[in-house]
Swiss-Prot record:
Fluoride-specific ion channel. Important for reducing fluoride concentration in the cell, thus reducing its toxicity. Na(+) binds at residues 76, 79. Its main location: membrane. One of its GO terms (molecular function) is fluoride channel activity. It is a multi-pass membrane protein. The chain crosses the membrane at residues 1-21, 34-54, 72-92, 101-121. This is Fluoride-specific ion channel FluC. It comes from Acidithiobacillus ferrooxidans (strain ATCC 23270 / DSM 14882 / CIP 104768 / NCIMB 8455). Disulfide bonds: none annotated. The keyword Transmembrane applies. The gene is fluC. Keywords: Cell inner membrane, Cell membrane, Ion channel, Ion transport, Membrane, Metal-binding, Sodium, Transmembrane, Transmembrane helix, Transport. It is found in: Cell inner membrane. Pfam families: CRCB. Na(+) is not transported, but it plays an essential structural role and its presence is essential for fluoride channel function.
Amino acid sequence: MFATFGFIALFAVLGAWARYGQTLLVQAAFGRGFPWATLSINVLGCFLMGFLFFETLERISVSPELRTGMLTGGLGAYTTFSTFSLETLVLFENGEAVKGLLYMFTSLFLCVGAAFAGAWISHST
């Protein structure tokens, strides 16, 4: 259990650094007019989550502690959108398309709505 926490902490630091570094690079290249940095992080993070989840499950032998550190710590710090995408993918792969669609649209509506609500509360205080 302590090894798992250690790997999560280590990879979380690396994931956060990667996110910050990529944000600086993308914003320097494309500016801040559109959230290209966040979009690129979310897309790459989702790709890596899907890829590493199955690679470390089916092809590459790594300890469960290291796997959890990479996926939960590293990609969790890099982007939480990758976890949402993996959970949606798993629902579809398990033949639960209706549940997957419900989860996708509910998450999008609630999360964007929560962001708007937080902004509204912040602006009104």
